């Protein structure tokens, strides 16, 4: 039952609200001599409040001075509700009733907060008196009847305002509208900053936990795990507990969610599982409920829960658990949790044996991720960079910066050491050799007349001419300077590395460089040669480790055409077999015993008793092979000695001398002769035309300088050196017919290391006398085909 107490205004405090009040007062003074109080309605005794009289009197006096109505809904209720007396009853409700504290921050600037809700009790007379004294401070700006309250704060109420300020000081509260408004603006800025920080949180990462997960051990003797084995493993893992957390993972698609799986014993059908977790050592506790996930067996069920960190980030920021400063991109976050299991009116906990479960995480904000720095390779400047074109410099810069290469048009690229396996005779036209030592000055240049090119002087580091007959030692420090002329390139040849004697990228017709050594070659009137390379000079090296295995066609048969083809495949297609020129002197020191020693050393070293050092094509990228798997350079010895003798006798009758002055006419003009006389070519005569003898003073093939050496001619890339075996002792008779003014160098075979050696004793050929070699090739030699590398018949 609602009891409403009527209030009346005292005469001293009564103020007219309308202009006609003065007229009414004058009329009442004239008619009524004594003012009378309005009648007061009496209440029933059952409705009266049982309070002491002093309190009632004080209350009546207060009610007379208050423009508000105080309503008490029941005796049990102690909270006083206040509302404006001018408000309509429909607006008075529990939701719209004004409270002692402002509802929002907008009203906090103008309203006065005196007490908390717990401080205002109905039975405390002092608090109620103080409350009613300061009722005038309550805000009326939003009231519907503000027009009648404009004169509320006049001069008569200044004393009440002073009393109000003093009362605030007694309770430790001072009202200042300016400071309150300043605090409100600060709160607004703090709220906006908090929202910005919460928005900047973009990622959560779970690093580790102290949870021991449950792992099913595979069976030992069966493929599938039986129910009894699973039950035994679960019982061992639970270790007598009714609830056990066995999994904590972070979702892959949403990093802000942590999911957990809990095993509980099936003690009853109705179960309640709750997860309690905290971020600040249990000062603040958060709860999440676990739901049923699946049934493991009749004794164990599994529950699942999810912790959404995004829903808690505002609380974490307010509590300063997460701090996102400007200079930081991440913040550590630690979580502690435990499980509570309610079943059969009993509660069980899983708190990791009293230690709780810990999760160690990290929070990241937007823009805090450090970008991966792409390393830029800075190479030291070299001499080649100075002469590099801008286009090449741009290509090198782009290749060392992956970010730039992504935006450039992609094309097929190969590394510099790529082996193309190109067997085309024209491959040097499309492939630029990147070798630092073998670098031609001019590509695709053919010199038809080599007479105009003069060879460079021999190196001073070579042996002197006076030591021709002695033992020549190898000069390991003989490395010539880089090339300075366009027609001269000095290159070292390293025998241990099996470096090819070709100084270009082509193995068929290189136009970059060739060897100009002390050996002089010329052509006769009938054998035409065409020089196709510039003259260069570099020292010869050991031939004992020369690599014969890198041939393009290892399956060729032992035919005369194939053998001759492989021996000359490094020459230009128009070049014929070279012949020696000049006078040859007779060496009296050569006898039949030397020939026998030569045959014996060859029999000990080679199974086929013959070996031909040929200028064959080689793969530039496969120079390290030391195994000779090729069958093209091996020549089976002739079993018939009569054939050799016939060739010698026939060659002596048809040989004609040639001179070095006829080199200008060595260009081949007619190929028909080579085609017609191909069937008469006997390759055995070529083998018998050069003799090699054993010499004890020349252990190795060494480079030396010869003052009487003629310019190199007729060979495109390397000197053709043929090492043959004499089948009989009659071949030494050829050396006896050589003139003493012949070309001095000679080839020997050392008995110790069975290697071909170059000496200065004699290089036997037959120009002045009958020469079977020239007789055999009296006509034009056959022409090599560039495409198929076969005889062109």
Curated annotation (Swiss-Prot):
Give residue ranges for domain CBM21: 235-360
A GO molecular function held by the record: protein phosphatase 1 binding
For region Disordered, the annotated ranges are: 1-20, 450-491, 616-671
**Bias category Polar residues: which stretches?**
1-10, 623-633
One Pfam match: CBM_21
Q: Which InterPro entries match?
A: CBM21_dom (IPR005036), CBM21_dom_sf (IPR038175), PP1_regulatory_subunit_3 (IPR050782)
* Keywords on record: Glycogen biosynthesis, Phosphoprotein
The answer to whether keyword RNA-binding applies is no
Q: Which GO terms describe its cellular component?
A: protein phosphatase type 1 complex
Q: Where is the composition biased (Low complexity)?
A: 649-665
Q: Which residues carry this modification: Phosphoserine?
A: 415, 424
Q: Which GO terms describe its biological process?
A: glycogen biosynthetic process; glycogen metabolic process; meiotic cell cycle; mitotic spindle assembly checkpoint signaling; regulation of glycogen biosynthetic process; response to heat
Q: Where is the composition biased (Basic and acidic residues)?
A: 637-648
Purpose of the protein: Regulates the activity of glycogen synthase. It is most probably a regulatory subunit for protein phosphatase type 1.
Q: PANTHER family, per this entry? A: PROTEIN PHOSPHATASE 1 REGULATORY SUBUNIT (PTHR12307), SERINE_THREONINE-PROTEIN PHOSPHATASE 1 REGULATORY SUBUNIT GAC1-RELATED (PTHR12307:SF51)
Q: What is this protein called?
A: Serine/threonine-protein phosphatase 1 regulatory subunit GAC1
Q: Which organism is it from?
A: Saccharomyces cerevisiae (strain ATCC 204508 / S288c) (Baker's yeast)
Encoding gene (name): GAC1
